[in-house]
C-alpha cells in the first residue's frame, strides 16, 4: 500500500492565516475525493507553490507526489525538501530553527529570519504527522492543543524578533557544549500578532542551561537542556546521570527590566528525562544514586495563562497564549542537579518583554521546569534551583509579582512553594526580574504591577495584590517595607513567602538597601526546601541540588562528605543548617539523615513539630504547618508563623517579626523595638525585640519560637511525650515572663496559671533548668484567647478532633467564618438540633426542615443487603471475627439496603453486650446500630431488643458489661425515633409505638416502676456523690454541674457513667408521660410511684440531681406537688397554681432527710429551692401546653394559643409581699437567729419568681426588706 499526499497549486500566498485555513480544508476534501486514499501515516504536506519547476497534475489540478519508499516505511520522514538544489542538514530547517539530530559534539546554531519568508512545513514525529498549517488554524480557532513531540524532533520556527533592539554579548553561547541525544519534549504554542504568526518553541539540548522561552531575543532563541544520555563532563567526577521526572505543568517565564526590549514571551519547553551530574568538584558515588520512577503522567487541568485584563498588563499585548498539551508519557522531573559555575552572568543575557503573559502560579502548579540563565536561577513551583554564583537582583530592587514572592534588593527571592538560594552570596544584575503573574519594572527600581510591590531601599512582600508606587511606600534604609497583602519582610535577613519559609542558620548579612543571604542562610518553602551551608538542598518535589555536587534522588538518603542532600520531602540533613521539607523531615547532626517520620534531635536545637519536623542547632526550619524553632533564627512554615530574633521572617497572613526592623503584614501585626513598622490590624509589641505572630504566634528573644499559631502543641501528638521525645537542649533560650505581657492589656499569667488553664495542651516540664514549657504554654494561651472555639476540653476525643483542624494552615480563619456564619444557617441549626435534642414533646419541630438525605431517599425502594455481601458477613460471624462483621455491615448498610433482623440481633447480643470485646469494637458496633437506626428506624415489629433483655442489663449480671451504657443509649434512641416517626406521620396511632408497648402507664406500669428504681439507684451510687462544697445548683432542669478536680480517675469514670445512665432513664420517663395521650394522668401515676423513692434518697445533692435532670416539667411539678402536700399539716384543695405555691410557703415543712443536724437552715434552704423548681416548671407547663396531648400540642404551639387562665393564678403584689414576709418571720422564729445571706437570697429570688409568674409589675412593689 502506498502513501501519498496531495498539495493544492492554487492555494495563494501563505502569509494569510485565512488562506492557509482554506487550503487545509481543500486538502482534506481532495484526500476524501481521491479513490483508494489511505490514511496518512508517515508523510508530509509540502507546499510546492513557490517552486518554479513544473509538477505533473491530475485532472483535478492537484499534484500527486509519492514520498514513501520501501526502506523508509518504518521510520518517519522528518523533513522533505523537493527542491532541485542539494540541501544540507542544517538548512532543512527554517533560519531560526535548530535540529537536534546528532548534537553531541556540535555547537548550538543560532539564526534569525523573517517569519513571513518561511515556507509552511509539516513535521512527522513518532509516526504521527503534525500539520503545522492545520496546527496554526487550530491555534487561531481555539481548538485542541498541538501534538506531542518526541525524539528526533525538528523544531518549528521561532518568532520574528529582528526589530528588537538587543544590546549585549552573546559570546557565552559559543562556549555551551551540546550533548548527544534528544529527549521527549512537549510542544507549546502561543498566539502573536496578526502580522507574524509564532510557532512552537522547542528546546535544543545543551549541557547545563535549561531552554529559555521564546520571549527572549531571537539571537537567544534556544538555550539547550542537559541531554538524556550525556555523561558527566570531564571536569566533574563520574556521576551517573540522574533520572528525572518532570510534570509538564505551568511554564516559568522571566521579565527583564530593560525598557528597550519587547519580545513576545513564549512557553518554556520541557526539560529532558535525565540530567548529567554537572557538579565539578564533589565526587558522586554511583552506588548511592537510586533510580527514579519514569512513567508519571500528568494531565493539565487548568489554563496556564490568565487573561490579560486581570493582570494589569498593557492592553496592546497581541494575544493570550494557548494552552499547552503534554504527552501522557512525559515523566516528571524529580531530581535535577544544576551547576552554573562555568556560566558568566551578564546584564543583557536575558531580555523579556513586559507585555508577556506569564503563567499563573496561583492557579496552576508550576512544574519543575527551570528557566536558567548563566548565573541566574529562577525557581518555579515545586522546584529548587541553586546558583553557585548567587541570586540575581534587579537594579534598584527586585520585583516579585502578585503570585507569591518578591525579591529584596539585597537579593533573595522565593517563589510560591519554591525556594531560591544562593550559596555564595547575592549577585546583582541590573535588570533581571522574575514574574509570576505579571511584572512591571521601572529603571528606578520601584514599580507597581497588578500584584507586585518593589522598593529600592527595602524589602516588600506581596501576597496576591500589592500596590506600590515610587513615592507611596514606607521605606526605611535597612528597614522593612510592608505591602498591602499578607506579607512582611525583615531587613535582618530572611524573607518568607506564601507557605514557604526562609531560615538563616545563624548567619545573616545585610547589605545597604536590602537583604543579603549568606551561605549559611536557608529559605524553606512549604513543599520545597533548599539549603546551602555546606551545599545541601532539598525539595519536596524531588529536586535536590548541592553546591558541593551531591545529588540525591527520590526517597533515598545519600551522604557525601560535608553535605547531605535528601529528596522527596522525606529527610534532609546537613551539619550546619538544615531545612526539613514539608511534612516529614528529620535532621541529625554530622550529615546523617534520619528516616521518615521519626523525631530526632541534635545538640543545640530542639526539634519539635506536630508532624515530623526535627531541628538542629544553628537554625532549623521545619516546613508546612508544623514548626518548632531553635536558637539562631528558626522560622516555622505555612499559615501562622513565628519569628525569632535571629532574623527570620515568615509570611502569609499571620506573620510574626523579630527585632531589628521587622514589620508584620496585614491582619494582626506585632511590633518589636528596633525600627519595626506594624501593619494594619492589631499591633502587639513585646520587650526584647520579640514579636508574637498575628493572632497566635509567640517569639522568644533567644530564637525559640513555638509553632504555628493555630497548632497547639500538646504532648499527645505533636511535640514531646514523656517516654519517646528527647528533652529540649540547653541551647534553647528560656522565654522571659515579660513576653506574656503583650499589648492590648493582657494580664500577666504565671507559668502555673497558664499550664493549669490549658492543662491538656501543656507538657510536663523538662529536667533541664534552661528548658521550660513556656513557649508552648504561651502559644496555647494566645491560641485559646483569640480562638475560643478551638478551646480543648478535658475530653481526649475533642483533643483529637481539634488539633488536626488547627494544624491546617489558615484553619483559624476558616473556622472563625464558620462559627460566625453557621449560627444563622437554618440547615446547620437543624442538624445541631438533631444531635442536641430537646425533650420529647418538642421534637416534632425538627422535621420542619427535612434533611437532604431524607429528601433524596424518598421514592427509593428498600431492599435487603444482597446475598453475596451478606455471605461475607455471615462468614465473619462463623469465624468469630466481630470487627470484620461490624466493618462489613458498616459498608453494606445504605439507604437502599437494610440488614436482616437476625444480623441486628447478633450485633446487639453477641457483640455490643459481650463481655470480652474491646472498647473499640464496642464503639464500632454502637455506631453501626446508630447508622442502621438512622437509615432504617426500628418499629414495634422489627425492634430487636425487649424489656427482658433491658432488665438483664440494668439489674442482673449485665450491670458489669462494658457495653451497658451504649446499649441503653441505643434503646432510648429506638424509643424516641419510633415515637417521633409515628407522631409525624400517624398521629392517631401512638398506641402502635414501641414506647406505648413497653412504657405505657396503663399497659405496663411495672416497667415504669422499674425505670424509676433504676433511676434512683443510679442517682444514689456512691461514685455519683461529690462533696457538698463542690456542688453548684441551678433552678431549672439541666445537668448538675459538679467539680471533679479532687476525684480519682476511677471513681470519676464511674460517676460519669452513672450520669449518662441517669439522663437516659429520665428521657425514658419523659416519653412515658407522653405516650398515653393523657399527660396529666400519666404524670400523676408516675409521680405517685416516685414519691416513695424520692423520700429514700439520702443526700440533698442526690435529690438535687434527681430533680434537675428530670426532662418533663409536668412530671417534676407533680412530684414536687405531692411532696409538699404530704409535708403540710393541713392539705389544701387548691389545684397546681401560684396560690398553691404561696400556701406551701407558709404551711409546709421538709419531709426530706437533712444531711447535717447542725445546719438546720439548709433544710429550709432546700425547701425554698424546691419551691423555685415548682414555679419554674409550672411556667413551662402553662406556656408549652404540657397538659394537653402531644397530638394536640403541635397545633396549639403553631397557632400561638395563649394558655388558659388557671384557678389560683390571680395573685396580687400584696399577696406575694404578705406571704414572703410571713415566711421570713417564721424562719427567724424557728431558727432562732437571723437568716444567713444564702437563704435570704433564695427567698428574694422566690419573690421575684412569683412576681414574674403572676405577670406583676415589680415597680409597684414597696421597698423590699432583705
From Swiss-Prot:
UniProt subcellular location: Nucleus, PML body
Low complexity bias locations: 183-197, 532-553, 764-777
Region feature (Interaction with SLF2): 779-1266
Motif SUMO interaction motif 2 (SIM) positions after renumbering to this chain: 64-68
Keyword Transmembrane helix applies: no
Motif segment (SUMO interaction motif 1 (SIM)): 45-49
Region (NSE5-like domain): 865-1200
Basic residues bias spans: 22-31
Any one GO CC term of the record: cytoplasm
Annotated spans, Required for inhibition of CAPN3 protease activity: 857-1266
Compositional bias ranges of the Polar residues kind: 560-571
Swiss-Prot/TrEMBL keywords: Nucleus, Protease inhibitor
Main location: nucleus
Gene Ontology molecular function: any one: peptidase inhibitor activity
Residue ranges, annotated region (Disordered): 1-35, 183-206, 532-732, 756-812, 1024-1052
Superkingdom of origin: Eukaryota
Role, per record: Inhibits the protease activity of CAPN3. May play a role in SMC5-SMC6 complex recruitment for viral restriction. Forms a complex with SLF2 and this complex is required to recruit SMC5-SMC6 complex to PML nuclear bodies and sites of viral replication.
Subunit-level organization: Forms a heterodimer with SLF2. Interacts (via SIM domains) with SUMO1 and SUMO2. Interacts with CAPN3 and CTBP1. Interacts with SMC6 and ZNF451.
PANTHER family cross-referenced by the UniProt entry: FLJ44216 PROTEIN-RELATED (PTHR23187), SUMO-INTERACTING MOTIF-CONTAINING PROTEIN 1 (PTHR23187:SF3)
Descriptive protein name: SUMO-interacting motif-containing protein 1
Amino acid at each position: 500500500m502506498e502513501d501519498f499526499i496531495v498539495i493544492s497549486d492554487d492555494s495563494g500566498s501563505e502569509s494569510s492565516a485565512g488562506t492557509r485555513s482554506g487550503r487545509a480544508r481543500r486538502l482534506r476534501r481532495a484526500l476524501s475525493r481521491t479513490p483508494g486514499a489511505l490514511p496518512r501515516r508517515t508523510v508530509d504536506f509540502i507546499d510546492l507553490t513557490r517552486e518554479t519547476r513544473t509538477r505533473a497534475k491530475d485532472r483535478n489540478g492537484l499534484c500527486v507526489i509519492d514520498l514513501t519508499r520501501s526502506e523508509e516505511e518504518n521510520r518517519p520522514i522528518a523533513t522533505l525538501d523537493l527542491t532541485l538544489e542539494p540541501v544540507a542538514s542544517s538548512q532543512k530547517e527554517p533560519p531560526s530553527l535548530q535540529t537536534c539530530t546528532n548534537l553531541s559534539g556540535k555547537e548550538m546554531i543560532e539564526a534569525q529570519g523573517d517569519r513571513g519568508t518561511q515556507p509552511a512545513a509539516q513535521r512527522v514525529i513518532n509516526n504521527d504527522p503534525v500539520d503545522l498549517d492545520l496546527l496554526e488554524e487550530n491555534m487561531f480557532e481555539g481548538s485542541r492543543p498541538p501534538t506531542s513531540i518526541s525524539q528526533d524532533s525538528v523544531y518549528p520556527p521561532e518568532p520574528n524578533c529582528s526589530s528588537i533592539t538587543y544590546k549585549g554579548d552573546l559570546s557565552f553561547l559559543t562556549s555551551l557544549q551540546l550533548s548527544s541525544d534528544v529527549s521527549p519534549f512537549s510542544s507549546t504554542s502561543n498566539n502573536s500578532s496578526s502580522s507574524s504568526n509564532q510557532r512552537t518553541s522547542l528546546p535544543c539540548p545543551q549541557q547545563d542551561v535549561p531552554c529559555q522561552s521564546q520571549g527572549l531575543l531571537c539571537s537567544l532563541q534556544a538555550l539547550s537542556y542537559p541531554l538524556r544520555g550525556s555523561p558527566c563532563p570531564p571536569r566533574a567526577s563520574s556521576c551517573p546521570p540522574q533520572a528525572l521526572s518532570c510534570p509538564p505543568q505551568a511554564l516559568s517565564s522571566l521579565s527583564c527590566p530593560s525598557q528597550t526590549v519587547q519580545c513576545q514571551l513564549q512557553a518554556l519547553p520541557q526539560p529532558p528525562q535525565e540530567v548529567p551530574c554537572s557538579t565539578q568538584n564533589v565526587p558522586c558515588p554511583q552506588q548511592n544514586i537510586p533510580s527514579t520512577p519514569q512513567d508519571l503522567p500528568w494531565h493539565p487541568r487548568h489554563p496556564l495563562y490568565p487573561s490579560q485584563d486581570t493582570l494589569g498588563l498593557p492592553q496592546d499585548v497581541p494575544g493570550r497564549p494557548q494552552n499547552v498539551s503534554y504527552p501522557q508519557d512525559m515523566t516528571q522531573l524529580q531530581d535535577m542537579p544544576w551547576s552554573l559555575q562555568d556560566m558568566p552572568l551578564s546584564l543583557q543575557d536575558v531580555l523579556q518583554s513586559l507585555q508577556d503573559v506569564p503563567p499563573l502560579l496561583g492557579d496552576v502548579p508550576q512544574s519543575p521546569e527551570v528557566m536558567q540563565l548563566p548565573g541566574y536561577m529562577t525557581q518555579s513551583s515545586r522546584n529548587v534551583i541553586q546558583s553557585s554564583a548567587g541570586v540575581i537582583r534587579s537594579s534598584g530592587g527586585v520585583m516579585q509579582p502578585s503570585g507569591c514572592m518578591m525579591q529584596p534588593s539585597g537579593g533573595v527571592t522565593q517563589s510560591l512553594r519554591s525556594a531560591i538560594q544562593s550559596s555564595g552570596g547575592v549577585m546583582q544584575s541590573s535588570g533581571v526580574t522574575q514574574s509570576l503573574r505579571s511584572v512591571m519594572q521601572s529603571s528606578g527600581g520601584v514599580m507597581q504591577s497588578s500584584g507586585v510591590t518593589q522598593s529600592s531601599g527595602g524589602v516588600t512582600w506581596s501576597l496576591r495584590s500589592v500596590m506600590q508606587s515610587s513615592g507611596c511606600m514606607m521605606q526605611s534604609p535597612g528597614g522593612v517595607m510592608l505591602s498591602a497583602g499578607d506579607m512582611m519582610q525583615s531587613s535582618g535577613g530572611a524573607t518568607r513567602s506564601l507557605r514557604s519559609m526562609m531560615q538563616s542558620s545563624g548567619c545573616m548579612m545585610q547589605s545597604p538597601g536590602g537583604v543579603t543571604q549568606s551561605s549559611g542562610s536557608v529559605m524553606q518553602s512549604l513543599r520545597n526546601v533548599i539549603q546551602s551551608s555546606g551545599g545541601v538542598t532539598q525539595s519536596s518535589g524531588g529536586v535536590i541540588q548541592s553546591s558541593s555536587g551531591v545529588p540525591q534522588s527520590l526517597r533515598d538518603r545519600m551522604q557525601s562528605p560535608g553535605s547531605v542532600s535528601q529528596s522527596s520531602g522525606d529527610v534532609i540533613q546537613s551539619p550546619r543548617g538544615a531545612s526539613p521539607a514539608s511534612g516529614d523531615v528529620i535532621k541529625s547532626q554530622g550529615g546523617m539523615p534520619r528516616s521518615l517520620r521519626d523525631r530526632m534531635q541534635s545538640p543545640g536545637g530542639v526539634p519539635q513539630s506536630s508532624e515530623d519536623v526535627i531541628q538542629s542547632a544553628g537554625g532549623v526550619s521545619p516546613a508546612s504547618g508544623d514548626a518548632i524553632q531553635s536558637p539562631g533564627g528558626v522560622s516555622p512554615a505555612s499559615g501562622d508563623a513565628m519569628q525569632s530574633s535571629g532574623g527570620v521572617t515568615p509570611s502569609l497572613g499571620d506573620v510574626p517579626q523579630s527585632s531589628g526592623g521587622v514589620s508584620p503584614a496585614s491582619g494582626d501585626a506585632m511590633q518589636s523595638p528596633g525600627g519595626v513598622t506594624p501593619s494594619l490590624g492589631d499591633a502587639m509589641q513585646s520587650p526584647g525585640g520579640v514579636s508574637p505572630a498575628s493572632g497566635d504566634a509567640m517569639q522568644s528573644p533567644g530564637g525559640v519560637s513555638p509553632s504555628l499559631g493555630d497548632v497547639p502543641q500538646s504532648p499527645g501528638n505533636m511535640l514531646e511525650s514523656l517516654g519517646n521525645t528527647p528533652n529540649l537542649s540547653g541551647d534553647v533560650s528560656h522565654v522571659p515572663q515579660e513576653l506574656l505581657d503583650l499589648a492590648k492589656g493582657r494580664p500577666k499569667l504565671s507559668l502555673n496559671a497558664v499550664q493549669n488553664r490549658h492543662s491538656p495542651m501543656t507538657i510536663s516540664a523538662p529536667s533541664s533548668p534552661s528548658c521550660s514549657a513556656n513557649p508552648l504554654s504561651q502559644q496555647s494561651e494566645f491560641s485559646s484567647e483569640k480562638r475560643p472555639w478551638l478551646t480543648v476540653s478535658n475530653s481526649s476525643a475533642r483533643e483529637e478532633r481539634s488539633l488536626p483542624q488547627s494544624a491546617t494552615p489558615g484553619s483559624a480563619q476558616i473556622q472563625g467564618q464558620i462559627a460566625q456564619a453557621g449560627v444563622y444557617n437554618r440547615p446547620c441549626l437543624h442538624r445541631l438540633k438533631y444531635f442536641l435534642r430537646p425533650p420529647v414533646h418538642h421534637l416534632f419541630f425538627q422535621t420542619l426542615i427535612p434533611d437532604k438525605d431524607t429528601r433524596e431517599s424518598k421514592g427509593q425502594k428498600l431492599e435487603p443487603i444482597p446475598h453475596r455481601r451478606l455471605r461475607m458477613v455471615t462468614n465473619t460471624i462463623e469465624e468469630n471475627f466481630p470487627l470484620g462483621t461490624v466493618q462489613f455491615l458498616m459498608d453494606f448498610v445504605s439507604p437502599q439496603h437494610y440488614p436482616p433482623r437476625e444480623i441486628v440481633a447478633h450485633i446487639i447480643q453477641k457483640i455490643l453486650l459481650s463481655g470480652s470485646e474491646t472498647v473499640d469494637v464496642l464503639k464500632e458496633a454502637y455506631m453501626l446500630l446508630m447508622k442502621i437506626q438512622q437509615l432504617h428506624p426500628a418499629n414495634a415489629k422489627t425492634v430487636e431488643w425487649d424489656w427482658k433483655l433491658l432488665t438483664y442489663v440494668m439489674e442482673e449480671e449485665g450491670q458489669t458489661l462494658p457495653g451497658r451504657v451504649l446499649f441503653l443509649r441505643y434503646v432510648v434512641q429506638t424509643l424516641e425515633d419510633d415515637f417521633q416517626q409515628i407522631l409525624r406521620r400517624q398521629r392517631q396511632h401512638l398506641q402502635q409505638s414501641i414506647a406505648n408497648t413497653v412504657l405505657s402507664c396503663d399497659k405496663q406500669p411495672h416497667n415504669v416502676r422499674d425505670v424509676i428504681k433504676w433511676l434512683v439507684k443510679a442517682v444514689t451510687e456512691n461514685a455519683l456523690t461529690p462533696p457538698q462544697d463542690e456542688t453548684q445548683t441551678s433552678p431549672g432542669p439541666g445537668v448538675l454541674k459538679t467539680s471533679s478536680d479532687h476525684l480519682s480517675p476511677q471513681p470519676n469514670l464511674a460517676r460519669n457513667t452513672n450520669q449518662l445512665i441517669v439522663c437516659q432513664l429520665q428521657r425514658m420517663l419523659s416519653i412515658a408521660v407522653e405516650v398515653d395521650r393523657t399527660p396529666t394522668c400519666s404524670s400523676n401515676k408516675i409521680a405517685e410511684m416516685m414519691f416513695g423513692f424520692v423520700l429514700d434518697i439520702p443526700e440533698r445533692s442526690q435529690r438535687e440531681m434527681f430533680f434537675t435532670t428530670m426532662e418533663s416539667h409536668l412530671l417534676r411539678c407533680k412530684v414536687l406537688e405531692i411532696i409538699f402536700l404530704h409535708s403540710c399539716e393541713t392539705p389544701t384543695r387548691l389545684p397546681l397554681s401560684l396560690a398553691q405555691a404561696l400556701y406551701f410557703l407558709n404551711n409546709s415543712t421538709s419531709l426530706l432527710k437533712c444531711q447535717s443536724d447542725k445546719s438546720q437552715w439548709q433544710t429550709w434552704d432546700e425547701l425554698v429551692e424546691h419551691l423555685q423548681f415548682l414555679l419554674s416548671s409550672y411556667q413551662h407547663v402553662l406556656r408549652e401546653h404540657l397538659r394537653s396531648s402531644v397530638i394536640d400540642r403541635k397545633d396549639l404551639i403553631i397557632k400561638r394559643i395563649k394558655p388558659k387562665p388557671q384557678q389560683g393564678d390571680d395573685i396580687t403584689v400584696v399577696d406575694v409581699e404578705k406571704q414572703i414576709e410571713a415566711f421570713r418571720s417564721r424562719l427567724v422564729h424557728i431558727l432562732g437567729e437571723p437568716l444567713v445571706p444564702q437563704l435570704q437570697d433564695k427567698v428574694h429570688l422566690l419573690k421575684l419568681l412569683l412576681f414574674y409568674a403572676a405577670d406583676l409589675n415589680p415597680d409597684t412593689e414597696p421597698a423590699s426588706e432583705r
